[in-house]
Every structure is written in C-alpha cells, then in structure tokens.
UniProtKB/Swiss-Prot annotation:
Family: Belongs to the amidase family. GatA subfamily.
Pfam families: Amidase
Taxonomic placement: Bacteria, Bacillati, Bacillota, Bacilli, Bacillales
GO biological process: translation
Catalytic activity: L-glutamyl-tRNA(Gln) + L-glutamine + ATP + H2O = L-glutaminyl-tRNA(Gln) + L-glutamate + ADP + phosphate + H(+)
GO molecular function: ATP binding; glutaminyl-tRNA synthase (glutamine-hydrolyzing) activity
Function, in words: Allows the formation of correctly charged Gln-tRNA(Gln) through the transamidation of misacylated Glu-tRNA(Gln) in organisms which lack glutaminyl-tRNA synthetase. The reaction takes place in the presence of glutamine and ATP through an activated gamma-phospho-Glu-tRNA(Gln).
Protein name: Glutamyl-tRNA(Gln) amidotransferase subunit A
E.C. no: 6.3.5.7
Organism: Exiguobacterium sibiricum (strain DSM 17290 / CCUG 55495 / CIP 109462 / JCM 13490 / 255-15)
C-alpha cells in the first residue's frame, strides 16, 4: 500500500505521531518517479535537495501542527522556484533559474510542504494535450497511448500515477480541470484573484489562475487553504482573508440548488460522457439536491472570444522574451536579428501561432472588429453566469466533451484541438471558480464532472464535490 493512499489528514497524524518519517514520504515519491515516469513523462526536473530537507524535518515533525508539513508536492514548470529551473516547457527558458519563489510556492514551503520537482506542460501553457512541450510529451497513466490533457498535463499525470500526493497547475482556459478530468483526479480553478499570480509566468493575465490537483476533494481543500489569500505582490489579488475550506466538507447537500445548462449537452459531447454526467446528476438528486435545466445562451461565443483575448494577451506578455535579458539568445550582427532569430529558435509552433493570432487581433485595422468585440462578448458570457448563479448554488456539467484522445490524433487540426476546452473556457471568461471531480469511465478512460460556483464561494463547490465523491468512491489508481 502506498503511503499516499492515506491522504493529507491521515498522513499528518502518522508523521506527527512518528509512525511515518518525512524522509520516507520523499523517498516513496522518488522511488515511484523512478519506476513509472519513464512511461509517463510528468517530470522535467527533480529537486536534488528534497531528501536532505526531509531528513532535517524528521527531527521536528512531532512538533508541527500544519497538515501539509513534510508532504511532497510537484509544481508546474511555469511557476517560478528559487534555485530550480523554470522552463515553461520551452527551449527558450531551458536554463532559466529564478532568484525567488512564487507566492504559492513560498506559502507551501512555509506550511512545510517539500517541492519534489517541476512538472511537464504545454509550452508556455498553450495547449490541450501536453504534446506541445519542447522536451517530451506527457502520457495518460490510464492508457499511455492517450494524452493526459493540457496544459497542466504533467501536474495531473503525476498525481494520477502516484508520483506525488498533490501538485500545482495553472488554468487559463481549462488547463487544470481538463487534465484532471482526463486523468481521473480532482482539479480546481479558483476564483480569479483568490490565489496570487506572483511568480506565475504570464500567458493571459486576465484569465490565468493557479490551483491544486489532488487525489481527493479533502486534499484539494487543504491545499487551497494554504495558498489562497491576498498578496501585495499581485495587483490583481483580491482582498480576502485566509479560509479553512475543509470546514465545508460536511457530506450534506440537502437543499442544494443545482443548475444544469442545456448547452453543455449539445453537439460535440460524446454519448459516453453524457451518460456518466446524467448518472452523476441523478446521484446528486438522490443526496437531496434539487436540479433544474437552465440556459447560458452566450456560451456559443466562448471559444472564439477566448482565443482572441488569450492570444492577444499572450502576444503582449511574450514580447519580453527577446533574447536579451534571459533565455535563448541567437547570434546575429544586428539587434533586430537577435530578436527575430532568438524567438524563431526558442518558440515552438503553437506559441508562434498564438502570438501571430494575437498580434493580428490587436493591430490597428482590426482591433475593433476582433479584440473589442471579443471583450463585449466576454461581458455577455459573464452576465449569463451571474444571472444563473443569482438563483442557484452551483452549475454542473461535463468537464470535457470526450475522454482523453490518442497522442497525435489532433496535432494537424488546431481547431479541433481548441474545441476540447469548450466546456471550461466560459468559466475563465466569467472569472468564477470550478472544480473537476472523477465521474466514471468510458472505455477505461476517466470522465470529469465540472462543478461551477459563485465568485469566492469555493466552499460550496467543495461541499458539493465532497458529497459526490463520498457517494461514488472518487479516485482510483490506474495500473501502470
């Protein structure tokens, strides 16, 4: 039996009572990575100091009250870590070693968690399959011929494969929730502004959020409790007080009002996914929740809106990678050629595609027709969510339209690839929180149930997700 099967709460008791050493947990993580990561490809680098750090922590473990003390965590490689490479899955930052930790990493270290290593991802978080990493693709632990989802594919796969107890990912249009669904783990995108973005390498600043991926809802709540809260270093950080989200895990959802958008069961959603989500809805009803069908009519504009806005923000954010200050630097005689050749050599095809799309949308002749119109559509999408959530506690539906697809199956069709995020993108545009929890299998591959909540009401999302998890069994470890 893996020590990680105990979860945060039980592991804390075992460590505090001296029945399990922190060094044993770290060693188990490294041993598991050594055994299975050759098949999965979840890690890009490992923390060479982790074991020595764990041995020092063994000596003080019995005095520590924080539930995360001594527990191993993986960090997505677009979240900066002091003294460890942060590549963003790109050759451009192959040798970049930050001088400071991101706020979320700092808070986890203060809580006693140990960073085991940095996790693979789509380059600069641009992708839905984790095939866009400049180093290696990540494979789904449930079936290594299939993708794990993206862009936080390494974060989801590492948890699903039992390499770490939990991980951090980032979510711009579904990049935590979609991989969580594909890999059968729990993944939360918090309300925009709840978790500091300081130290997250920006893709689309008005959409990006850091969040936790875990085996269970309870572990997820522990992790969010540690990283949420105001940060002076992030101008978009909300003025919210720290919260213990585990207090919401009552197992009782009697009277919970649930909305189910009819648009989330339309064309493009596989029958297997629909069947599993309808079964999940019936389960929630049997637990005492009330369910009504609603409409989010402007969701049909979400995909186009997102790719215009996110690409526009990316073209601006990635302008900083110029071959001068850090990262790849091409040899050239003229300064303009240094910029041009450095970016040509350092960026992959998908990143170049989105930079070009964003630059086009922001150009003077097309700004009103594309970028401005997309901002107007975003307002309509947000209004839809505000209206529904004024009358309901949560909105539920599938996380992804299909289970994980095979590696290489959509590489030549960017539009089909983009459509994999059609059910997660609206949530980022609205800025509301959402979680994906395991909700069955289709042909041996996991399906995710997405639970969407009101701004800064992660507690109700956790309450609903936890009750569903208790009733259905939740996480299962795939056979590797």
């Amino acid at each position: 039996m893996s020590l990680f099967e105990h979860g945060v709460k039980n592991l804390h008791t075992l460590v505090k009572d001296g029945e399990v050493k922190v060094s044993e947990l770290v060693q188990e993580s490294f041993d598991r990575i050594d055994r299975v990561d050759g098949k999965i490809g979840a890690f890009l680098s490992l923390n060479e100091d982790a074991f020595e750090q764990a041995k020092r922590m063994d000596e003080i473990a019995k005095h520590e009250a924080n539930p995360l003390f001594g527990l191993p965590i993986g960090v997505k490689d677009n979240i900066v870590t002091k003294g460890m490479t942060t590549t963003c899955g790109s050759k451009f930052l192959e040798n970049f070693v930050p001088a400071h930790d991101a706020t979320v990493v700092e808070r986890l270290h203060e809580a006693g968690a140990i960073t085991i290593g940095k996790l693979n991802m789509d380059e600069f978080a641009m992708g839905s399959s984790n095939e866009n990493s400049a180093y290696k693709p990540v494979r789904n632990p449930w079936n290594t011929k299939h993708v794990p989802g993206g862009s936080s594919g390494g974060s989801a796969a590492a948890v699903a494969a039992g390499e770490v107890l939990f991980s951090l990912g980032s979510d711009t249009g579904g990049s935590i929730r979609q991989p969580a669904a594909y890999c059968g783990v729990v993944g939360l995108k918090p309300t925009y502004g709840l978790v500091s973005r300081y130290g997250l390498v920006a893709f689309a600043s008005s959409l990006d959020q850091i969040g936790p991926l875990t085996r269970t809802v309870e572990d997820n709540a522990y992790l969010l409790s540690a990283i949420a809260g105001h940060c002076d270093m992030d101008s978009t950080s909300a003025n919210v007080n720290p919260t213990d989200y585990t207090q919401a895990l009552t197992g009782d959802i009697k009277g919970l009002k649930i909305a189910v958008p009819k648009e989330y069961f339309g064309e493009g959603i596989s029958e297997g996914v629909k069947e599993n989500i309808r079964a999940a809805i019936k389960k929630l009803e049997s637990l005492g929740a009330t369910v009504d069908e609603v409409s989010l009519p402007n969701s049909k504009y979400a995909l186009a809106t997102y790719y215009l806005l996110a690409s526009s923000e990316a073209s601006s954010n990635l302008a900083r990678f110029d071959g001068i200050r850090y990262g790849v630097r091409a040899e050239a005689d003229a300064l303009e050629d240094v910029f041009k050749y450095s970016r040509a050599q350092g960026f992959g095809d998908e990143v170049k595609r989105r930079i070009m799309l964003g630059t086009y949308a922001l150009s003077s002749g097309y700004y009103d027709a594309y970028y401005k119109k997309a901002q107007q559509a975003r307002t309509l999408i947000k209004h839809d969510f505000d209206q529904v959530l004024a009358n309901y506690d949560v909105i539920i539906g599938p996380t992804a339209p299909t289970p994980a697809f095979e590696l290489g199956a959509q590489n030549d069709d960017p539009v089909t690839m983009y459509a994999n995020d059609i059910l997660t993108i609206p949530i980022n545009l609205a800025g509301v929180p959402a979680i994906s929890v395991p909700a069955g299998l289709v042909d041996g591959l996991p399906v995710g149930l997405q639970i969407i909540g009101k701004h800064f009401d992660e507690a109700t999302i956790y309450r609903a997700a936890h009750a569903f998890e208790l009733a259905t069994g939740g996480f299962a470890l795939p056979k590797l």
